[in-house]
Amino acid sequence: MPEAEKLATVSIEDVQARQDSRRIPINKVGIKDIRHPVRVGGRDGQEQHTVANFSMYVNLPQHFKGTHMSRFVQILEGHDTEITVQSFREMLHEVAERLEAESGHIEMAFPLFVRKTAPVTGVQSLMDYQVAFIGEIHEGEPELAIRVVVPVTSLCPCSKEISRYGAHNQRSHVTVTAKTRDLLWVEDLIDLVEEEASCELYGLLKRPDEKYVTERAYENPKFVEDLVRDVAIRLNDEDRVLAYNVTAENFESIHNHSAFAEIEHDKTGEPRR
């Protein structure tokens, strides 16, 4: 009999299952930053192949020495189908059940590509957005949040007001983390943010498009404070969002530092609008 088969027939002690005498529970234990290919479902009904970074954790009671690390990878290997918000919830349940835990946490971070059309010439190009699905489950009750980083253009109202011509503008990152009630597409959040910026970004622009976006930003100046407030208003009006955190970081073109603003709001218990 081959040596591997001999080992398979021998009962090997499960060290992780030993009792631990220190009697200190662990809030989160698991695997961090494991890369795995996934297929993500989109609003247009198409799926997109990408590579995601997964971090997967469970709680560990005080009487157990360790958790079963290999089971996290087994769960990932079992999800080779398209990942949607619904299947992500199912993965949360599976983690808690397979690891026999009261609570679990999964974060799946990945780049999402969206095909955009230039505003004047109609030329198409891809834009990438950093997205994360963040899930928590406790005693069988899952909660899901979506985080997306949306690059936009911001133009300074003060610079426009005091200058004889021109105004300083820069690329900004608006990050929205939204706890959701019902199905909310990542693309819905991207659209919401881009509509509130001085101007949205594109992967490819021709000269007529560049003229348009330059003038669009000039006609729509916003401080970093304006940006987070306007996005917050839109999120307040979105019934599918239960709670949110929105930040804006302007990579200032006339300073060697960024401008930053943040709003956090929990809508739980508020009547639907």
UniProtKB/Swiss-Prot annotation:
Q: Does the keyword Hydrolase apply?
A: yes
Q: Which UniProt keywords apply?
A: Hydrolase
Q: Pfam families attached here?
A: GCHY-1
User: Might you name a Gene Ontology BP term for this protein?
Assistant: tetrahydrofolate biosynthetic process
- Name the catalysed reactions: GTP + H2O = 7,8-dihydroneopterin 3'-triphosphate + formate + H(+)
Name the residues annotated as site: May be catalytically important. Answer: C156
* NCBIfam families per record: PRK13674.1-1
What exactly does this protein do? Converts GTP to 7,8-dihydroneopterin triphosphate.
The name under which this protein is listed is GTP cyclohydrolase FolE2
